[in-house]
UniProtKB/Swiss-Prot annotation:
Name assigned to this protein: Calcium uptake protein, mitochondrial
Binding residues for Ca(2+) 2: 256, 258, 260, 262, 267
Effect of inactivating the gene: No visible phenotype.
InterPro entries: EF-hand-dom_pair, EF_Hand_1_Ca_BS, EF_hand_dom, MICU1/2/3
Family in the record: Belongs to the MICU1 family. MICU1 subfamily.
Purpose: Calcium-binding protein maintaining matrix calcium levels at low concentration. Regulates mitochondrial calcium dynamics in planta by restricting influx.
Binding residue positions for Ca(2+) 3: 450, 452, 454, 456, 461
Length: 498
């Protein structure tokens, strides 16, 4: 009975050795043609290390390795919810998600200390890693397109949550003024930074500190002096910013329902409610009540209304004060946009960042081509080294507010004289719109919007991008705010004539 005697000899071995021997015996019986019978058993019985013998077989080692790797990854995923545990695990280094950081900050409230917005945080990887499959330029384009669709198609709650950078101890999500700008204006990450996106989704890691330029303007009507914007104030500002600058006077006439040259609080609230019904992000809040974000209250009950009508709401708002406020609000948003691109706080932005601000409003079908033209600025040293000041940035933005007459001037000149030169462009801006554009601004614009690279401006493409930005910020629905103010202007003229 050789098998029985062999079993008895094996039973005298330690339990671990017996287990490995049984595994080996099963493998030997199953594949006797491939492995000599004497080799494995002899090695074990002769006192050789059973683990080494098993590893030489290969399958058990792979099985154990797989379990170990899976357990390690599972532990990493579980522990990624705690910044302390992760930093300790990797020697104290900060970890970010695939999405990379939003915008690092130099001011205010630290967002890195805020609580995560999900019970299941995403697996994190080292921030600013050069080992991503796709380069930063490609990832910026992907995130930019996503954020643009988010602004135009998502409900206001989602837009607010994505771009807001502050969460209080009570769980309320708030915005800084720079967050408001990014939620409304399509912007690229600054070219002088390593950033690839402007916000983050629920469940992702907090992006650390967000860069936010301080805003004295928003502090004027900040009741609690924290410099932060609530969701109801966000809806309020989005609605006001949808009014074109050329329609400020028309807007006031619409507010002044009794035609006495002043606006009281009830008139203001009535027309604001109507305006929200014409705005895509405000349409869900026509009744003035906030839904979502676990908050309740009227959109009109905020610091701005108190700024307009006093604490008791009895003061009247005059035309001059309203018009000045609207112009200051528009200018402040422009300043925040410039500060966003002025990443190194030099008081000027690069030619590339200025070009990015111009093409950011382009539709998706034209964006890639325009971005290629922006990237080609680096091939021309005199363009690459140009810097644009805040004054030049504002002067170019004025063209958007006077796009109607400027468009007519460009098309009329093009039909009469053919190609449009830089001198013609500058003269049209000066004589028709009263705007003085610098040579640097015009040269960058001609380079970016020269579709066939013949040295001339593609007028259609240039004007289409400028017009699209105005439309995207307004985000009208149904007839649209432009029609709304047009009808209001006709009504006010009829009232005046009668």
């Amino acid at each position: 009975m050789p098998a029985l005697s062999h079993y008895r000899s094996v039973s005298s071995l330690p339990s671990v050795d017996r287990s490995f021997l049984l595994i080996q015996r099963l493998r030997i019986h199953g594949s006797s043609s491939s492995f000599p019978e004497s080799s494995p058993s002899a090695s074990i019985l002769s006192g050789a290390d059973p683990l080494k013998c098993t590893v030489s077989g290969g399958s058990l080692a792979k099985w154990i390795t797989g379990i170990s790797a899976g357990s390690a990854l599972g532990f990493l995923y579980w522990s990624s919810g705690s910044s302390d545990s992760i930093s300790g695990l990797f020697g104290g280094s900060n970890l970010l998600s695939f999405a990379d950081s939003s915008t690092p900050s130099v001011c205010g409230v630290k967002v890195g200390d805020l609580k995560p917005r999900s019970f299941i945080p995403k697996l994190s990887l080292p921030g600013y890693s050069s080992g991503f499959i796709f380069g930063d330029a490609y990832r910026r384009k992907i995130f930019f397109n996503y954020e643009k669709r988010l602004r135009l198609q998502s409900p206001p709650e989602k837009v607010f949550e994505y771009f807001a950078s502050v969460r209080t101890d009570k769980g309320e999500i708030l915005m800084k003024p720079a967050d408001l700008m990014r939620a409304i204006v399509p912007v690229f990450p600054p070219s002088e930074s390593h950033l690839v996106r402007e916000g983050y989704l629920t469940g992702e890691r907090n992006p650390g500190e967000l860069r936010c330029s301080p805003s004295e303007f928003f502090m004027l009507f900040d009741v609690d002096n924290d410099g932060l914007i609530s969701f109801k104030e966000y809806i309020f500002f989005v609605t006001l910013l949808s009014i074109p600058e050329s329609s400020f006077a028309v807007a006031f006439k619409m507010f002044d329902t009794d035609n006495n040259g002043e606006i009281d609080k009830e008139e203001f609230k009535t027309v604001m409610s109507l305006m929200r019904s014409q705005h895509r992000q405000g349409v869900g809040h026509r009744d003035g009540l906030r839904t979502g974000l676990h908050m309740t209250g009227s959109v009109e009950d905020g610091g701005l209304v108190e700024y307009f009508f006093g604490k008791d709401g009895s003061q009247k708002l005059k035309h001059d004060k309203f018009t000045k406020f609207m112009k200051d609000l528009t200018e402040e948003m422009l300043r925040l946009e410039f500060a966003h691109y002025d990443y190194k706080r030099r008081g000027s932005i690069s030619a590339k960042d200025f070009a990015l601000s111009m093409v950011a409003a382009a539709d998706a079908s034209h964006l890639s081509k325009l971005l290629d033209r922006v990237e080609s600025l680096s091939e021309h040293p005199h363009l690459r080294d140009m810097r644009i000041s805040l004054k030049e940035f504002k002067q170019f933005d004025e063209l958007r507010s006077k796009l109607g007459p400027f468009s007519l001037a460009l098309f009329a000149y093009g039909k009469a004289n053919g190609l449009l030169t830089m001198k013609d462009f500058k003269r049209a801006a000066s004589q028709v719109c009263g705007i003085t554009l610098s040579d640097n601004v015009i040269e960058i614009a001609f380079h970016v919007f020269d579709s066939n690279q013949d040295g001339n401006l593609s007028v259609d493409e240039f004007l289409r991008v400028l017009h699209r930005r105005e439309r995207d910020v307004a985000q009208p629905i149904a007839k649209g705010l432009s029609r709304y103010f047009s009808d209001g202007w006709k009504g006010s003229k009829n009232c005046s004539s009668s």
